[in-house]
Structure formats: C-alpha cells, structure tokens
C-alpha cells in the first residue's frame, strides 16, 4: 500500500518500517502495541481480518481511509474526548496504510476520522501544540 499525503502534512512515508516509530507510538499509548498488530503492520499485504473491522455502528468510515472526513468538535466522538478540528490534513487523508487503520480499529477509538493519542507525534507541527495543551489532557 502506498502512503499518500496532501501538501502541508509532515509525515514520514517510511514510518511503517521504522522501529523508532514503533517505540515512539508505544510511549504515547497506554500500553505496548499487541503483537498481532505489530506483525500485521510488517506484513501489510495481508488482507484485513474480520476481527480488525468488527466494530460498533458508530465506526462509519472504511478502515482503509481513516481521515476522509474532516473531524469537528460536533462530529462523532472517540471514547475519551473531543476530536480537535484543526488537526486534519487539508483536503486529504491522514494515511491509507493498514497500520494506522488497524491500530485505530483495534483500540476501538476510530470515529469520524479522529486520531488516537499514540499518533500525536505524526501530526503536522501546527497541530502538535494544541494536542500538547488542551487536547492532551483529555486523551491521557
């Protein structure tokens, strides 16, 4: 799968194969990433298992396109807080990779294009300050 980005989004295209990225993601999450998700991330050609997409009806977007909709404070909310509306890529997707979609679905927080806390370091710099401040306290 190819990772595509719109202008203005700073996101490493090689982060899927980077062990450093996995370490950073783990520090932003409540616990270690389950082994089955790490394995699936390394073998991205595998199709989604039914378990990866079995979710409540509130998860309305396909897992292959996590940020098709621009999240707003009034949209569907993740389990632990509001979605910061400033932190969407202009007119585009955050990522179409299997890893980002599966991790969000596995944690059960993916809703309306919101990003979970452990992807915070991959948001473009203009958004990081908002997450570090008001939003960060809602997620952690």
Curated annotation (Swiss-Prot):
Expressed in a range of cell lines, including B-cell lymphoma and prostate. Residues 34-88 are annotated as: Disordered. It comes from the Eukaryota. This is Putative uncharacterized protein encoded by LINC00114. The gene is LINC00114.
């Amino acid at each position: 799968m190819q990772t595509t980005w719109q202008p203005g989004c700073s996101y490493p295209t090689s982060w899927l194969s980077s062990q450093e990225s996995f370490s950073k993601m783990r520090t932003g999450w409540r616990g270690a990433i389950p082994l089955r998700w790490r394995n699936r991330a390394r073998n991205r050609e595998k199709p989604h298992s039914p378990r990866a997409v079995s979710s409540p009806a509130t998860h309305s977007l396909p897992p292959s396109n996590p940020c098709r909709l621009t999240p707003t404070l009034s949209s569907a909310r993740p389990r632990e807080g509001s979605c910061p509306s400033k932190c969407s890529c202009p007119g585009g997707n955050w990522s179409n990779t299997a890893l980002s979609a599966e991790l969000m679905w596995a944690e059960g927080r993916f809703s309306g294009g919101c990003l979970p806390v452990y992807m915070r370091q991959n948001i473009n710099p203009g958004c990081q300050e908002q997450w570090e401040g008001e939003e960060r306290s809602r997620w952690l």
